[in-house]
């Protein structure tokens, strides 16, 4: 009888011990899961945006040189003024140890008023790059842009008297396929034509082509570029497809034209092919890179490069709502819309900066919160 009682007591103690151990194990796992969750959210949202000192200290290890070419037109003065102010603020704060040169890329002016406007703007800011080609989207502007990164290229002499008479209407293709049309450029005396230019210059690690109706989330862009410093044959963007392309060229990969990045050697591959094969700028760029052969560092991104979902604009597979990890948000055709998107990102960064001052248990909930999406009826 006594022996059975001892067995029962031992069994109860054993069960209690196992239960206690299991409970402790579950609690410990829960705490570890919360720590991992917090670390994940911090990595996603805080670095490098909030932990600025740590981020900038890390930036000392891998400084980069970036040419940020924003494709614009002479008439888009207000858009350039907005982007110039906004981007320079981010560059001063988040690229302290890096080189970031912002330039607005223009074709030739269409009339004397445009010439006077861009001359005054250049006197004030000095950040315009005029190309010796009529203003266009798909008729060779990008190809000529990339030739500016070759040895021997001389900038267009905007203030020369010779430029007074170089007024040309914009040119566009209208949907028909152009299988072999040569680019015609209008170099002024002192400028070399393409065939007289040399090898790629390596003044920059990265060369960006972006449209002025896109907002670039520069802190996120800078963070991403740190991972690719020193890479050659680099091509980054959102992969696109066009059903309009003929079957023979439909399957090669290319990046959507509103934002992509190349290394200097890839810029040369685009610039040296002077004949337009495909009447879509982004597809022509991708095709030239494809023909070059070994593109060993092609990086495709979908979620961080997108068209903004807007009211009454229909839907396409490239669209998304605003998200903090975006690199480029496209289809911002008005200054109020650009301003709305820019302000949303600034408020999100401010909110997450405030989160960093909280204790860990409160910080997670703070980071999971988001600033309400703004009204986009602008």
Swiss-Prot record:
Glycans are attached at residues 53, 97, 180, 354. One of its GO terms (cellular component) is endoplasmic reticulum membrane. Disulfide bonds: none annotated. Belongs to the glycosyltransferase 31 family. Residues 30-378 are lumenal. It catalyses: 3-O-(beta-D-galactosyl-(1->4)-beta-D-xylosyl)-L-seryl-[protein] + UDP-alpha-D-galactose = 3-O-(beta-D-galactosyl-(1->3)-beta-D-galactosyl-(1->4)-beta-D-xylosyl)-L-seryl-[protein] + UDP + H(+). Residues 1-8 are cytoplasmic. GO terms for biological process: 4,6-pyruvylated galactose residue biosynthetic process; cell wall organization; meiotic cell cycle; protein glycosylation. Signal peptide: none annotated. The lineage of its organism: Eukaryota, Fungi, Dikarya, Ascomycota, Taphrinomycotina. Keywords: Cell wall biogenesis/degradation, Endoplasmic reticulum, Glycoprotein, Glycosyltransferase, Golgi apparatus, Meiosis, Membrane, Signal-anchor, Transferase, Transmembrane, Transmembrane helix. The chain crosses the membrane at residues 9-29. Gene3D superfamilies: 3.90.550.50. InterPro entries: Glyco_trans_31. This is Beta-1,3-galactosyltransferase pvg3. It comes from Schizosaccharomyces pombe (strain 972 / ATCC 24843) (Fission yeast).
